[in-house]
Amino acid sequence: MDKGVYILLLKNNECRILTGARGEISFSAGWHGYVGSALGPGGLSRVLRHFRLNEKRDKRPRWHIDFLLLSPCFQVMRAYCIHTSEKIECLLAMQMTGKVISGFGSTDCSCKGHLFYFADDPHEDILHLVSSISEKEGPSSHTDILVP
């Protein structure tokens, strides 16, 4: 599968989740957007792994996002995928408009975080963002929206 970056959009109830070494985090009811990279082996098939994990909740957590995917409080609504070989995950995270969940999903970079909270459905804003970045990446880049 192609390589790229993605935003996973989740809807959730108010809850508290133990997230490994980060400890317990309180999440307000609403929407969360997680910016991830799929430049390694398997590429964007990582998004399909996220869908499966959220549906079956049958594996141990490997990444920060897995703690949310394993919780019955969170449901994956869709994923926005940008097909690219460029490392633009942090660029995407810096342009997200939601409230950053500090330190979540950003242990391997200097970003404040890669998880963002929105009180209302941010679909239109995220769609505009990924379309804009995809255009800047040039003709070899394109965007898909996947639904579980």
Task: Annotate each PLM feature.
Residues 138-147:
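Conserved short beta-strand edge segments in small beta-sheet-based binding/regulatory domains
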Residues 39-134:
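Aromatic/basic micro-patches that form nucleic-acid/chromatin recognition or nuclease catalytic surfaces
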Residues 33-38:
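GIY-YIG nuclease signature motif recognition
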Residues 1-2, 7-27:
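An N-terminal domain-cap segment
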